[in-house]
């Protein structure tokens, strides 16, 4: 039984040594004309390119609205009632939200979020 603490310590050191800080970076702002398209970018920090993210929208005076979960392979699942004009894609550590045929109600803050585990 003397090996148990050593094994635990080895696993603990391995886990803590493999952690690196996860940071999401978004493009600061974007603008486009009604009817046009816009592409927003969320970049995962080095070593986290396999992570999924979620895109959210927050219109003025309203709570956040879940738009979609976006995986590293570009597959995504949208929230209820999200129009087809909203789509997601991925390339390496970058996750994109594209809004096509912009409408006035699309004027909002958009932000990305992750859960801190690779998927």
Curated annotation (Swiss-Prot):
Location relative to the cell: Secreted; Cell membrane
Residue span of region Complementarity-determining-2: 70-76
Ranges where the record places region Framework-1: 21-45
Keyword Disulfide bond annotated: yes
Signal peptide (from-to): 1-20
Region called Complementarity-determining-3, residue ranges: 113-119
Disulfide bonds listed in the record: 42-112
InterPro entries recorded: Ig-like_dom, Ig-like_dom_sf, Ig-like_fold, Ig_sub, Ig_V-set, IgV_Light_Chain
Function: V region of the variable domain of immunoglobulin light chains that participates in the antigen recognition. Immunoglobulins, also known as antibodies, are membrane-bound or secreted glycoproteins produced by B lymphocytes. In the recognition phase of humoral immunity, the membrane-bound immunoglobulins serve as receptors which, upon binding of a specific antigen, trigger the clonal expansion and differentiation of B lymphocytes into immunoglobulins-secreting plasma cells.
Protein name: Immunoglobulin lambda variable 4-69
Organism: Homo sapiens
Classification lineage: Eukaryota, Metazoa, Chordata, Craniata, Vertebrata
Gene name of the record: IGLV4-69
